[in-house]
Design a protein with these regions (language model features):
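N-terminal targeting leaders that direct proteins to extracytoplasmic destinations
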Residues: 2-94
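Sterically constrained small-residue positions within well-ordered secondary structures
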Residues: 21, 92-96, 130, 171, ...
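Extracytoplasmic/secreted proteins, especially bacterial periplasmic and envelope-associated proteins
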Residues: 38, 68, 115-122, 150, ...
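Solvent-exposed, acidic/flexible segments
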Residues: 62-63, 98, 109-117, 153-156, ...
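Periplasmic peptidoglycan-binding/anchoring modules of Gram-negative envelope and division proteins
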Residues: 87-93, 105-140, 164-169, 204, ...
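Envelope-exposed proteins and targeting segments
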Residues: 97-103, 108, 133-135, 174-176, ...
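Short coil/turn segments at secondary-structure junctions
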Residues: 103-111, 146-151
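Periplasmic OmpA-like peptidoglycan-binding domain that tethers envelope proteins to the cell wall
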Residues: 142-210
Length: 210
């Protein structure tokens, strides 16, 4: 019986390890009430796994095109972004350091809830860190799946703008380094439960990759 249990434990451990290894590296971290250090660690560009592999000309051209696109976003109002712009932001963000924050707002409002102020201050402190100096950040507003598309799109725009204003007013962050984008209910994190609280979030992306 002991040998059987040892074998079973070994197989179970192997299964857990295999499951951990298949989690995509690009999946955004998500935390409730993260510290400023948690946010900073998530947003710091990760060093390449190896320095021996050279970047192909095609990859260099792709990165240059993405960086050029990011430059065009600075100081643009959230509502000026087209659907294609928002999709391109999401595509670039897939490979960049990012974190999902459940920033709470008043019901059907862009007013940041008092209970969310500690999280906002943690975010502001992290983005003010000298190690992130010069980075451009995307603040992507997301809503849950309750309500109409037009309403949620507008609400996500206003909530992303509210987060940006707070960071500028309270932490003196440069406006041109904070890009806001609203996605409404188009990118639900929990598609099985559209009304789930984790769908109401702000995704913060460091558009730098090194």
């Amino acid at each position: 019986m002991s040998a059987y249990l040892d074998t079973l434990k070994f197989k179970l451990a192997g299964t857990i390890l295999a499951a951990a290894l298949v989690v995509p590296a690009s999946v955004a971290m998500s935390q409730q009430n993260p510290s400023s250090q948690d946010i900073l660690n998530a947003l710091k560009p990760k060093p390449p796994l190896t320095r021996s592999l050279s970047v192909s000309p095609a990859e260099q051209a792709k990165k240059a095109e993405q960086d050029k696109f990011v430059d065009t976003l600075r100081n643009r109002p959230t509502r000026s972004l087209s659907m294609d712009d928002r999709q391109q932001i999401a595509t670039v963000a897939e490979t960049r350091p990012r974190i999902d924050l459940e920033i709470k707002f008043d019901f059907n409002s862009a007013n940041i809830a008092q209970s969310a102020i500690p999280d906002m201050n943690s975010l502001g402190k992290a983005l003010s860190d000298s190690s992130l100096k010069g980075s451009t950040f995307v603040l992507a507003g997301q809503t849950d799946g309750v309500g109409g598309e037009e309403f949620n799109q507008d609400l996500s725009n206003r909530r992303a703008d509210a987060v940006k204003r707070y960071l500028i007013d309270k932490f003196g962050l440069a406006s041109e380094h904070l890009v806001t984008a609203g996605y409404g209910k188009s990118r639900l994190k929990n598609k099985n439960n559209p009304s789930a609280s984790e769908n109401r979030r702000v995704e913060v992306v460091n558009m730098a990759d090194r």
